């Protein structure tokens, strides 16, 4: 741990205080013996070693008590060294005094040491006792509750770090955290400050906890509140270590600049950045996986139905008419998308979302006329049936459907975003080759307004892996930061349930469990918790999320002692009893108020909950050296 100059001065202060004590004690004794008799003076002078040793240890103890916990360990070490030197000085004087007598008349050292000055001996003993007390107050506080030996009401406990090392070895692929208990570290009582290295404790030096995608569904969910170091503690470290393909959603647009060159060095990888605000951005056709003629037509038609859902803003509404218009808008988009993909009137280069938007950009009358023409000329029964719904629809009803479909594809009128999903620089199937990474630099402000941009891109890559039908080189890791911005995506549930065999692993980041419930419902959220390999919680501020964590960590049995004192005539009588009570392993308020931001709780099936540190990249030298500078993260103070 590195300290500032002021903190170094505070740590070395026991040397100055001890030296001052050694200097003052003789003067104090001289002042006290001025008017004393000779026999009294003798004992005062004899007591000098005892006073010096005890006062040096006492002053150090009092000074240590006045300092913050994270400095006490270093102060205690300095105090122990200084006391040891002082004690050796007095012991050395006694040995020098006794040396001439050793060897005379058969006197041995074991016999001579019995005549050491008792003042020195007792001074050393008292000083050591005070040092032990100083060490105890310098250690992190132990648990406030006493666990019962019998688990009558439950026996929940935190996972042993040795067991954690077996499940999450240090040399794996996906960085999960650091193998140490933050709540048992010397800095546990002070807030984590990224710019102050003295608040880091063991963070940055402890062994890593990593996941090798070797158990469960290989999917992961991370919950961390706003400003909870989701990106710096998990996303960036994983991008620096994962050897397979990555598809990363980055609403903060900070990840790609930091890890791009590091990813390129990992086996000469092809790193693609989709950035609508950059002239150098790559682009691809999000419909290319639907244009594969080797896939049966019926399967392609079913895929079109699923993909068209991604174009709609799926917001839950209690208004039945709004739900109706949304459903019909989905049918309209499905019909027109199928027409664009299968119709002979379009060239292959025109089979994209721009063409779909061009149709919807027409007037309502023109769209209805085109739908009638499609119904009369298309050879596809699927398209004919889908279009037939709208050719006989009342004008006012169709107007509502048309407005909904047009509004949800409005973003395709923005040329930079339309070009992003309608190009040909690469194919969505390229991620299956094991050498391609894709970073989506889509600002959060745009995703808030037009979530469909991110949905269709991520949906295209997920569907491309399904279309590959198990023919992939390495598992593709979908790192979706702030996935709440995308809204409800049915395809994520499909990837969750069947993605393992298709080579896809999901790493989802939410700010609270409420966001997950908001999009998938209570039952859907439970399905996510049941299906993931593990769930991580950190920097939690939401009370409901804290309650959920507390319940999932389980209950333990604690001993509660009580003393009853009787009053009145039977004074002095008291009874002592021990009761067993149930207590949560960790209470909701402890999660919110006492857990530091660099601490997390990991829950997985069949294992105790794991409480450990977070691998914040700028605390680890090897990661800081590999990553480029983060323009958002505060820089550590330089000494």
Swiss-Prot record:
SUPFAM superfamilies: P-loop containing nucleoside triphosphate hydrolases (SSF52540). Its main location: membrane. The keyword GTP-binding does not apply. Keywords: Cell membrane, Membrane, Transmembrane, Transmembrane helix, Transport, Virulence. It is a multi-pass membrane protein. GO terms for cellular component: plasma membrane. Belongs to the VirD4/TraG family. Component of the type IV secretion system VirB/VirD4 which could be a major virulence determinant for subversion of human endothelial cell (HEC) function. This is Type IV secretion system-coupling protein VirD4. It comes from Bartonella quintana (strain Toulouse) (Rochalimaea quintana). The lineage of its organism: Bacteria, Pseudomonadati, Pseudomonadota, Alphaproteobacteria, Hyphomicrobiales.
